[in-house]
């Protein structure tokens, strides 16, 4: 899964899309100008690769890639911080609204919800986390994911097994979490366990080193992805690497080495962003590899369902009522 430089496909990007190892596209703000432009971009992508998964980070708050023509969603922390139990209804509404608006421009899924438990020390997570207790995170994330599914969108929990306990930003460094496995199982992993039991469709591991548990970060660790996630937690959904161009991934070697290590550890799809040369290097490294039947099945479940015509969505009472509820919630949170 790779990204694009701008709002239109370049010749190199068309070539990347047609590569047999390319399976997904991740979109950013630089790729978006308007809903009509996004519909045209998605249509062009689908004309080249009808099976291409199209994703975006669209959590709400400071991580919302599309703004103009989309409802501004509150940060995850607002739902329970401001509104208490009533926030769960708002979280479900926001999950539906986010998913419905994205599906209406052809995007399959958003990398959401964030399942990290905020410990008050991670600025890169911060208000992206729903709460500071696993029970509250679970309740709010469950509501948000329920809304997503009502709009035909699968959910992806991140950042396994929990990014909220470290100060470092894995975009810039490899943070180290020195807690024992028992501590993570009793706190940070609880939201993941709960949503896995409710058939969570996807998970994204963190680029964090849990040094007292394993010598490798989860994206490159068979222990984390196979022994813990697949076997102990019985997760049968898709595993997406976090961005392999991040500084936190450099421990695994060059781009090709990172890709191969992530696949060997158990990732179903590799994500690489902001570095076209990394995309080219990884596609070359994967030239002769084919996805396993299990990965193919798990990734197929990430395809968006119930495609919504955008004009029909904006004319619907369900959309108007949802927008009004979120606007009122945003006003009350200020």
From Swiss-Prot:
Residues reported in the UniProt entry to bind substrate: 57, 65, 128, 158-159
Molecular functions per Gene Ontology: beta-N-acetylhexosaminidase activity
Catalysed reaction equations from the record: Hydrolysis of terminal non-reducing N-acetyl-D-hexosamine residues in N-acetyl-beta-D-hexosaminides
One record GO biological process: regulation of cell shape
UniProt KW keywords: Cell cycle, Cell division, Cell shape, Cell wall biogenesis/degradation, Cytoplasm, Glycosidase, Hydrolase, Peptidoglycan synthesis
Subcellular location: Cytoplasm
Pathway: Cell wall biogenesis; peptidoglycan recycling
Alphabetized InterPro entries for the sequence: Beta_hexosaminidase_bac, Glyco_hydro_3_N, Glyco_hydro_3_N_sf, Glycoside_hydrolase_SF, NagZ_Beta-hexosaminidase
Function according to Swiss-Prot or TrEMBL: Plays a role in peptidoglycan recycling by cleaving the terminal beta-1,4-linked N-acetylglucosamine (GlcNAc) from peptide-linked peptidoglycan fragments, giving rise to free GlcNAc, anhydro-N-acetylmuramic acid and anhydro-N-acetylmuramic acid-linked peptides.
HAMAP family given in the database record: NagZ (MF_00364)
Similarity section: Belongs to the glycosyl hydrolase 3 family. NagZ subfamily.
UniProt-recorded name of the protein: Beta-hexosaminidase
Source taxonomy: Bacteria, Pseudomonadati, Pseudomonadota, Gammaproteobacteria, Methylococcales
